[in-house]
Amino acid sequence: MSLKIVVLAKQVPDTRNVGKDAMTPEGTVNRAALPAIFNPEDLNALEQALRLKEQNPDSTVHILTMGPPRATEVIREGLYRGADGGYLLTDRAFAGADTLATSYALAQAIKKIGVPDIVLGGRQAIDGDTAQVGPQVAQKLDLNQVTYVTSVDEVKDGKVVVTRHIDGGIERVEAPMPILLTVNGNAAPCRPRNAKLVMKYKRASAPMERPAEGLPYAEEYDKKPYLTIAQWSVADVDGDLAQCGLAGSPTKVKAVQNIVFKAKESKRLTGSDADVESLVKELLDSHTIG
């Protein structure tokens, strides 16, 4: 059977390179000051989507992301790996969204796309670590949902069979479509870019990124429709401004503090009985042990 699949993906700050300017005074992430990457667990979700596409002829995979214009890089990365297209939600009114406002915007976009058979997304984004957006989108769209998925094993008779991680082990679950699945980081890693697809889609862009008329490559977008990445605003997805961005975000950050890790004084032990006895006493006194 053919499947209509949407992958929720996010461009996130690389938290391995966080500096003193990582946060704004308002308590939101200063994305301009941090290098951006494809959210790791969203890549795991993309791989599951691409495997389903291979197993079910005539299926399609589209990437949906919300962010500034540079977030189209996430969609291009998906195209380079085998996705069929993408949608960029970009509007100043989306800025500063918490999980509630983010899930509202994504749900509105999915309604515009047409509710797919399967929505896939990473368990959580590394910039927030909430694991809330996927379940919230499912709730807003009244979709079945399974979280902490490690593999999508089978699609049959309008149902999906998945393996999911639970406390103390794994669980095999069957659930009817349409369905939203959130995928763990211990699922199969995403395949690398395909060189032919990189050459095909390297100039894929949203209208906001387009070169001016008369510049090199500008005419390609008329001749090659597949290079166009759909770009939607709040109005395009029939969104309510009161539920978008900061206006629709009840989560408020009380304070932000930059923490600088400094090397502490070290102590060298010789291994003598006296040193070991002294160390044990120190650990007991500090309640580290005992």
Features from the language model and the residues they span:
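N-terminal glycine-rich FAD/FM-binding segment characteristic of electron-transfer flavoproteins
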Residues: 1-290
